[in-house]
Amino acid sequence: MSHSVKVYDTCIGCTQCVRACPTDVLEMIPWDGCKAKQIASAPRTEDCVGCKRCESACPTDFLSVRVYLGAETTRSMGLAY
């Protein structure tokens, strides 16, 4: 099952998404584009289980972290009643 995790440049470097991820997909890396001087990165997307806890934890108005579920997951989600 393959999910993609995208971190946008609206990230404020708060680390909420990193702490929320149960499978350690995300980590913080140095970045000069925000006050915190760090941004979330997703180096281990193969470990993503698609729970979207990172999205829920993101405090920005435009979610800085988005999880795009793989085709198998979205297909099985359509079977629910």
From Swiss-Prot:
Note on cofactor: Binds 2 [4Fe-4S] clusters. Cluster 2 is most probably the spectroscopically characterized electron acceptor FA and cluster 1 is most probably FB.
Keywords from the named record: 4Fe-4S, Electron transport, Iron, Iron-sulfur, Membrane, Metal-binding, Oxidoreductase, Photosynthesis, Photosystem I, Plastid, Repeat, Thylakoid, Transport
EC number: 1.97.1.12
Organism this protein belongs to: Cuscuta obtusiflora
MF term (GO), any: metal ion binding
Residue ranges crossing the lipid bilayer per the database entry: none
Biological function: Apoprotein for the two 4Fe-4S centers FA and FB of photosystem I (PSI); essential for photochemical activity. FB is the terminal electron acceptor of PSI, donating electrons to ferredoxin. The C-terminus interacts with PsaA/B/D and helps assemble the protein into the PSI complex. Required for binding of PsaD and PsaE to PSI. PSI is a plastocyanin-ferredoxin oxidoreductase, converting photonic excitation into a charge separation, which transfers an electron from the donor P700 chlorophyll pair to the spectroscopically characterized acceptors A0, A1, FX, FA and FB in turn.
Subcellular location: Plastid thylakoid membrane
Pfam families registered for this protein in UniProt: Fer4_21
Chain ranges of the 4Fe-4S ferredoxin-type domain: 2-31, 39-68
Binding site for [4Fe-4S] cluster 2: C21, C48, C51, C54
Protein name (database record): Photosystem I iron-sulfur center
Biological processes, Gene Ontology terms: photosynthetic electron transport in photosystem I
PROSITE patterns xref list: 4FE4S_FER_1 (PS00198), 4FE4S_FER_2 (PS51379)
Quaternary structure and interacting proteins, as annotated: The eukaryotic PSI reaction center is composed of at least 11 subunits.
Membrane topology: Peripheral membrane protein
